[in-house]
Structure formats: structure tokens, C-alpha cells
Amino acid sequence: MQLASREWYARLRIGPLRGAGLCGAAALAVHLMSGAAQAQTLGIATMTPGSLNHTTASAIARVLKEKAGLNVLVQPTAGESVIIPLTSRGEADIGIANSLEVRVAVAESKLSNLRLIGAIHPLPTAFFVRKSTPLRTIADLKGKKVVYGFSAQRTIDIVMRAILATSGLTPADVSQVLVPNVVRGADDFVAGGVDAFYFAFGAPKVREVDATVGGIRALAIPEAGMEAARKVFADGYLAPAVPNPFFIGVEKPMGVYTWDNLLFTNATVKDDIVYKVIDAIVKNKADLVTIQPALRALTAAGLHISHSVPYHPGAVKYFSDNKIGIRGAR
């Protein structure tokens, strides 16, 4: 099987291992206003605890505080559909979301103040089922109860349609169980409300579910079906995964559905702050990885991708100073 060759993604294979958002936005706004007089205070908007992005934000916040002298607050929200406009409006200084969510948000809402920092790491994902079931492939989901909807992460439905398309399925071929976000979907899976849930590898929630239900399995995706998947979502690709503590549920070498996770900011954040953020996370990668193993994939060169969202001037200066050219989509 020929999988997409990803030098930075291969690093993951080694080593161990929308209403609610208004409350989060208000809390973050209060924090930022109260700290306005304090220089270099940052708010990082992310998803709820247990998600991959919350762990990533926690790792970045710790490094920025300990290594760059920045006062940082991690602010959970209901989902990426909340995070992106929140950051664009300046109610958060930094946000983390997947590349598709960012593209759609900008196209729909004309978020002219949003600025890209870079692609922080790949986002490997899967449909998971109980290990005790006979389900092994995406095709086996036909007629099964599957999480769907994702009102706080609207573009997840697009990704799910792409994954289902790899086996000739559409959402109409499964029994849709509506959830607001992936964390709720995982909780419904544990409670027995669905047969399969969708999540990113490396998230604490995946480990929690695996331990709670006595083992989970990641469903295999046929490489031959990726042509159909790209008609739904062009940026998705299969990347290699092997059984290890990071890839929980992977029972043998296989390809897992992947795309990029982005770090972004807004036009009001000072250039030197963005420069300092990039410099700190690149230089202190080892510290990041102790908290978030997915950040093994982080490289300075990997940050600078081609994207429809303009880069923040601070990021542009960092890439220029370090002679890092832009690269195409993976």
C-alpha cells in the first residue's frame, strides 16, 4: 500500500505514547480586559478538555510562559466554529483549529482580521468502534449508529462524508446520531448510544474511552477509495500509522485519514509577539512533546504552508529571517 509520504508526519510513529462558546468568549474577554495593563498577556482559544487541541494549547501555553516569559490563559470553548470568529474579533489572541474549519469560516463569514501563524501538526483521525465487535472497515458502518451533526464543529461532517465515500457510503447509509462536538460523541459511545465515534489520535479522550470500554479499534480506510474522498474534501490524505501508544486502536500498519491543524491569530496582535510565539515553540519542541506527543511532527519548515488565510506579519518576518519558503498542501 502506498501512503502519502510525510517526513514530518513520520515523527508521530516513534516514541510512546455553538452556545456554550458564548460563555467561554465572555470569560475570555473579561480576562483580557482585566489584564490589559499587563504586557504580553495572551489568551489561547481551544476546544474542551480531553480533545487533542486542548492538550496542544496547554503544551504551548506552558512553553510560552516558562520559556518566553508570556502570561498565557488556555480558554476552552464549545468547538472550532466558535474559536475562529472569536480569535478574528480579537477576543482571543491565538486559536487552534483544523484547516478545513478555517477555510470554511473565512469563506462564509469574511473574517478579514484573521491571520495565520502556521500549520502546527498533522491531524490524524479515525472512526473508532469497540474492539469486541466484528466491525473492521468503513464499509462495516452501513446501517450502524454513527455520530453526526457536530453543530460546534460544522466541517467535521464534510470530513465524515469524505471518509464514508472511501467505501461507497453516504450519510444516508448510516443511522445518524446528532452531537455538538467530538467529545460529546465519544461520551455517547461510552454510554452505548452509538456504534462508532470519530476522534483525533493522541487525544486524552481516546485513551479514556479505550480504557473505559475495554478496548477500541480504528476502522481501516481503503486507499483505493481516496479518489472518491478527495471529491468531497481535497486536502485530506492517508498517512501511515502503526500500533503504538499514540495510535490507540490501530491493530496493524494502516493508513489513517489526516489533514493539517492550524495555529492562527488576528491582525491586532503585535508582530514581535507572534515572532516570539513561533520562536519559542520551535526552540522548545522537546518540552512541548512531553505534554502533547502529536507535536513531535512540529518543525519550523512545516509551519509555512500555502493557505487562503494571509500570514501575520510577525510570522512572515520569522520565515524570512530563517529562510523558510512556503510549501504546498500535503
Predicted region positions:
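N-terminal secretory signal peptides that target proteins for export/translocation
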Residues: 1-16
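Sec/Tat signal peptide C-region and signal peptidase I cleavage site
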Residues: 33-39
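Bilobed "Venus flytrap"/periplasmic-binding protein-like clamshell domains
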Residues: 40-67, 72-73, 123-191, 285, ...
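Extracytoplasmic
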Residues: 69, 79-82, 89, 112, ...
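Acidic, polar ligand-binding/catalytic clefts
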Residues: 88, 92-122, 204-207
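Pocket-lining segment of extracytoplasmic ligand-binding domains
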Residues: 98-101, 108-109, 133, 170-177, ...
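Ligand-binding clefts/hinges and TM-proximal coupling segments of bilobed small-molecule sensing domains
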Residues: 151-162, 237-307
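An extracytoplasmic/periplasmic, membrane-proximal ligand-sensing/linker region
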Residues: 183-184, 191-192, 200-218, 223, ...
